[in-house]
Amino acid sequence: MKIKTRFSPSPTGLLHMGGVRTALYSWLFARKNNGSFILRIEDTDKNRVKNNSVQDILYGLRYLQLNWDEGPFFQSNRINIYKNIILFMLKKGIAYKCYCSKNRLDKLRKNQILNKKKPKYDNKCRNKNFFLKKSNIPYVIRFKNPTKGLVEFRDMIRGKISISNKELDDLVIQRSNGMPTYNFCVVVDDWQMNITHIIRGEDHIHNTPRQINLLSSLNAYIPQYAHTSMILDKKRKKLSKRCSSYSIINYINNGFIPEAILNYALQLGWSYKNQEIFSINEMKNIFNIKYINKSPSIIDKKKFLWFNHYYLNNISFNLKYKYFFSYCKKNNIFFDKDVNISGVIKDFLGRHSTFKDFIQTYDYFYKEINISNIKNIYLYNKLINITILKFLYKKFNLLNNWDLKNILLIIKESILYFKISFKEIAILIRIVITGKKQTPSISSIIFYIGKKKFLLRIKNFLKYLQLNNSNFSK
């Protein structure tokens, strides 16, 4: 049988690192075994579906290049399929209508808890012939779960799991509003889509015995299951779809690249010898479910940043360039054609852990400087500074060959002419063209920012000083 895995998120919030890891493991397992990877969107609970969640899921998977072979399938488009199977189950006597009111079920649950019993349905309607009954009284449809025996399966991570059918009640498979329930839709989809292996979080493990019983009642193939441990935040709490901090969209917006996200997600509960860095091909070749551990993993921001920093320094320049401009386009960041952004990337990106940090540090390459916001701007309002800036403007304006060598020559000439230190002239130029006291090599900044922008910023700075103080201090 051909291997088929699936990733089936519910669009009820943000796709976080737990979902990314599940998708990655399922994708890797399929790729390693020459199988298929299916994307399915479980959107039957319309009251919980969040706007843009589907788009965020698709965007995140595409960004990570976790390409799917089939889908995306939407459960909301398959409602009639589920209802027809429920009708079949009613006719076969493996499902039944339950007319118990919410009030009765609440009282039943309350009494069971008071008597220290496990809350479960008492099967009041199980053996009543309500199939042909026509009534205005609301009802749900329940699956006739076996009342004897055990449900046994071998989890690929946790080993043999066994649970008595006495612990399980008759699962609701259709709500009173006519909508099939999550647990039922999942079973039908896994059956009809020929899913062979299901990798998902351990929070689904309690659903597995019920789903196996449903599949058995339909004479369907029982997939193999692997339930991964939870991923926790820094407070050791389960990741939430409502928390944007750990969402894939947040990491993308902060400038994390696919290789780093995948490499970090891979090792949240998985390890192979002492190796930390894996290419995508290595992941596909090495990945094995037996290397997944049972203990929960904790998001480590420093480690995540380390991975991103590593890849920003080690991927090819062309790929780095592609990712960078994709990030800039998404954030409406554009550079003048005179700015040598390739040089900026080559020389300075490696110092940073994310594109966001990088772009904020060197914002003066694409943003105009608000001179009035420069701290202690009045300190530069001196005649000597004005004279130096006019001298620099004249010299650089005449420069035809814009390269580092000639830029340094003009700076040295200015130092000798005005009898000042390199530090003094460098600070002045930095303030004028970047608005900051600290930058990398000033000659590199001048070179990369380009002649046009460099001269314009000197001109604007001089104009600002003249407008704000016509009598320059000595």
From Swiss-Prot:
Family annotation (CDD domains): GluRS_core (cd00808)
This entry's Enzyme Commission designation comes to 6.1.1.17
The UniProt entry, under Pfam families, shows:
Anticodon_2, tRNA-synt_1c
- Residues involved in ATP binding: K241
**From the UniProt record, which GO molecular function terms apply?**
ATP binding; glutamate-tRNA ligase activity; tRNA binding; zinc ion binding
User: What biological-process terms (Gene Ontology) are attached?
Assistant: glutamyl-tRNA aminoacylation
Catalytic activity from the UniProt record: tRNA(Glu) + L-glutamate + ATP = L-glutamyl-tRNA(Glu) + AMP + diphosphate
A single Gene Ontology CC term: cytosol
Q: What class of enzyme is it?
A: ligase
Cross-referenced InterPro entries, in alphabetical order? aa-tRNA-synth_I_cd-bd, aa-tRNA-synth_I_codon-bd_sub2, aa-tRNA-synth_I_CS, aa_tRNA-synth_I_cd-bd_sf, Glu-tRNA-ligase_bac/mito, Glu/Gln-tRNA-synth, Glu/Gln-tRNA-synth_Ib_cat-dom, GluQ/Sye
The alphabetical list of record keywords is: Aminoacyl-tRNA synthetase, ATP-binding, Cytoplasm, Ligase, Nucleotide-binding, Protein biosynthesis
The family database entries (Gene3D superfamilies) matched by this protein are listed as: 1.10.10.350, HUPs
Q: Which domain of life is it from?
A: Bacteria
Specify where it is mainly localized.
cytoplasm
Its subcellular locations are: Cytoplasm
Q: Where is this motif: 'HIGH' region?
A: 9-19
Return the motif ranges for 'KMSKS' region. 238-242
Q: Which family does it belong to?
A: Belongs to the class-I aminoacyl-tRNA synthetase family. Glutamate--tRNA ligase type 1 subfamily.
Assembly: Monomer.
What is the role of the protein in this entry?
Answer: Catalyzes the attachment of glutamate to tRNA(Glu) in a two-step reaction: glutamate is first activated by ATP to form Glu-AMP and then transferred to the acceptor end of tRNA(Glu).
Protein name per the record: Glutamate--tRNA ligase
Q: Which taxonomic lineage does the organism of this UniProt entry have?
A: Bacteria, Pseudomonadati, Pseudomonadota, Gammaproteobacteria, Enterobacterales
